[in-house]
Amino acid sequence: MLDRQQVQKIAHLARLDITSEEEEKFADQLSDILDYFEQLSELDTENVPPTTRAIELSNITRQDSFELYHDRDALLNEAPNPEGDFFRVPQILNTDEE
């Protein structure tokens, strides 16, 4: 079973701010999920061929195409925080991660 400290670490890595009640609840739920995966790992899959999808699909992605967009100023004006000829986006990576 996961303890509250492990749940806090998972929440930190997922950038979630959770309450102490949620820590307790998530500890139980995540433990149940891990127990289920443990059961799945006990299954005999010796003669089961590997698959990438449960249902075979083909042509599920479109071909990439390049088109010039001639009104660059209009596009930049739609951005919430343009900086010169670029889009300024929020920082998502920290260097002080564990």
Curated annotation (Swiss-Prot):
<feature type="region of interest" description="Disordered">
    <location>
        <begin position="77"/>
        <end position="98"/>
    </location>
</feature>
<comment type="subunit">
    <text>Heterotrimer of A, B and C subunits.</text>
</comment>
<dbReference type="GO" id="GO:0005524">
    <property type="term" value="F:ATP binding"/>
</dbReference>
<dbReference type="GO" id="GO:0050566">
    <property type="term" value="F:asparaginyl-tRNA synthase (glutamine-hydrolyzing) activity"/>
</dbReference>
<dbReference type="Pfam" id="PF02686">
    <property type="entry name" value="GatC"/>
</dbReference>
<protein>
    <recommendedName>
        <fullName>Aspartyl/glutamyl-tRNA(Asn/Gln) amidotransferase subunit C</fullName>
        <ecNumber>6.3.5.-</ecNumber>
    </recommendedName>
</protein>
<keyword id="KW-0067">ATP-binding</keyword>
<dbReference type="GO" id="GO:0006412">
    <property type="term" value="P:translation"/>
</dbReference>
<dbReference type="GO" id="GO:0070681">
    <property type="term" value="P:glutaminyl-tRNAGln biosynthesis via transamidation"/>
</dbReference>
<comment type="function">
    <text>Allows the formation of correctly charged Asn-tRNA(Asn) or Gln-tRNA(Gln) through the transamidation of misacylated Asp-tRNA(Asn) or Glu-tRNA(Gln) in organisms which lack either or both of asparaginyl-tRNA or glutaminyl-tRNA synthetases. The reaction takes place in the presence of glutamine and ATP through an activated phospho-Asp-tRNA(Asn) or phospho-Glu-tRNA(Gln).</text>
</comment>
<dbReference type="InterPro" id="IPR036113">
    <property type="entry name" value="Asp/Glu-ADT_sf_sub_c"/>
</dbReference>
<dbReference type="GO" id="GO:0006450">
    <property type="term" value="P:regulation of translational fidelity"/>
</dbReference>
<dbReference type="GO" id="GO:0050567">
    <property type="term" value="F:glutaminyl-tRNA synthase (glutamine-hydrolyzing) activity"/>
</dbReference>
<keyword id="KW-0436">Ligase</keyword>
<keyword id="KW-0547">Nucleotide-binding</keyword>
<comment type="similarity">
    <text>Belongs to the GatC family.</text>
</comment>
<dbReference type="InterPro" id="IPR003837">
    <property type="entry name" value="GatC"/>
</dbReference>
<keyword id="KW-0648">Protein biosynthesis</keyword>
